Amino acid sequence: MDPCECSKTGTCNCGGSCTCKNCSCTTCTKSCCPCCPSGCPKCASGCVCKGKTCDTTCCQ
């Protein structure tokens, strides 16, 4: 299951406790872009959120 359903519903869940709304990700497959740390404009494809944020290696 793709945790990022942004392109379909505008909402998505990642990392279990992280819920993103009105996200604009179109290429993320295992993460929600707004879950990335501050200063991280986009999560890399295949990135998995850890807790409520992606770790910095997810940034691209």
Curated annotation (Swiss-Prot):
The keyword Lyase does not apply. It holds the Pfam family Metallothio. It comes from the Eukaryota. GO terms for molecular function: metal ion binding. Residues 29-60 are annotated as: Alpha. Gene3D superfamilies: Metallothionein Isoform II (4.10.10.10). A divalent metal cation 2 binds at C6, C12, C14, C25. SUPFAM superfamilies: Metallothionein (SSF57868). Keywords: Acetylation, Copper, Metal-binding, Metal-thiolate cluster. Metallothioneins have a high content of cysteine residues that bind various heavy metals. This is Metallothionein. The gene is mt.
